[in-house]
């Protein structure tokens, strides 16, 4: 059975996209708001953010350790219940009036918000979903491609 120190050792091996911090810098420079909407766990996100000195608001499920791991899903949508964090509801709440949503994702929990975002960058399972369901999406391999797109806007 794993404990908190085992999890932290595992999380310390995780890496982020090599262009992610450059992407964040460009967004800050241009006044674009960035949020991480995750169906993962706060404990994991915090560990990765701390390792890479990232300060971005995020929404995720809660992982609580008090001798054993417990999960809380404060962002679930009771009417749906598919994901622990309803990214679509959060995206709509955070969008604000007249703003364009550029949604970046790769997994199953990104499928619903991808159908409602203005611009979608997708890879892996999300790209397959978009392709198979007629959702307009730009395939990406890394954040460098998203940086190029953002720079082309101005």
Regions found by a protein language model. Name each.
Residues 1-22, 30-32:
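Metal-dependent phosphoesterase signature
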Residues 18-35, 40-154:
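C-terminal cap/substrate-recognition subdomain and adjoining C-terminal extension
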């Amino acid at each position: 059975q794993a404990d908190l120190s085992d999890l932290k050792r595992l999380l310390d091996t995780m890496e982020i996209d090599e262009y992610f911090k450059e992407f964040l810098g460009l967004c800050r420079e241009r006044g674009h708001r960035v949020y991480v909407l995750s169906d993962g766990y706060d404990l994991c996100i915090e560990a990765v953010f701390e390792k890479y000195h990232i300060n971005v608001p995020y929404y995720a499920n809660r992982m609580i350790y008090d001798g054993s791991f417990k999960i809380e899903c404060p962002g679930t949508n009771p009417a749906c219940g598919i994901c622990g964090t309803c990214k679509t509801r959060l995206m709509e709440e955070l969008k604000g009036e007249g703003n364009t949503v550029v949604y970046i994702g790769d997994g199953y929990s990104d499928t619903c918000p991808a159908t409602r975002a203005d611009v979608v960058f997708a890879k892996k399972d999300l790209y397959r979903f978009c392709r198979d369901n007629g959702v307009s999406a730009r395939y990406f391999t890394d954040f460098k491609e998203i940086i190029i797109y953002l720079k082309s806007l101005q």
